[in-house]
């Protein structure tokens, strides 16, 4: 389901069984957004149509926002899956430090939406930590943790590069 200018939500009757499935589901939207941004950028280079440059940057910005490591955004789900696969206490500390940093940044720059998302995400992190004993999700192994982190960084880097390239 897509709500224009707000976001989308994917629902399925199938239950997620592993943290890897959570990572893949969470990062596929922004990854395909990266592919679309690259296509628009190439189209801009070939045709000099400025609308394509605008679409590339707009799409990249939307997907970068979605990849902020804040729950309930996709970046938060990736971070949660990696952090809680390492160790639940390490995961809680990592997520709490990220939330604290985000709250500081949102206060410093006056970003109310970011602060709101952090508040929602902090509540979800707390409940995830409390439910960790009941969780049936299989954790990521070391290889999947590395692949997930690299996939995330490459996607964020690619989207950032598109914005930088259009700005040149």
Segments from the language model and where they lie:
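Hydrophobic transmembrane alpha-helices and their immediate loop junctions
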Residues: 1-168
């Amino acid at each position: 389901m897509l709500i224009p200018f707000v976001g989308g939500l994917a629902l399925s009757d199938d239950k997620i069984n592993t943290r890897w499935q959570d990572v893949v589901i969470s990062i596929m939207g922004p990854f395909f957004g990266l592919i679309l941004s690259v296509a628009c950028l190439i189209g801009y280079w070939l045709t000099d149509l400025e609308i394509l440059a605008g679409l590339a940057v707009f799409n990249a910005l939307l997907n970068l926002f979605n990849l902020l490591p804040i729950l309930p955004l996709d970046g938060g789900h990736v971070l949660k899956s990696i952090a809680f696969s390492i160790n639940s206490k390490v995961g809680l500390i990592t997520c709490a430090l990220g939330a604290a940093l985000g709250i500081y940044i949102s206060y410093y720059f006056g970003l109310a939406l970011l602060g709101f998302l952090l508040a929602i995400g902090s509540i979800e992190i707390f409940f995830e930590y409390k439910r960790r004993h009941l969780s049936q999700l299989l954790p990521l192994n070391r290889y999947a943790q590395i692949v997930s982190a690299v996939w995330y960084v490459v996607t964020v880097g690619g989207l950032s590069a598109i914005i930088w390239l259009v700005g040149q």
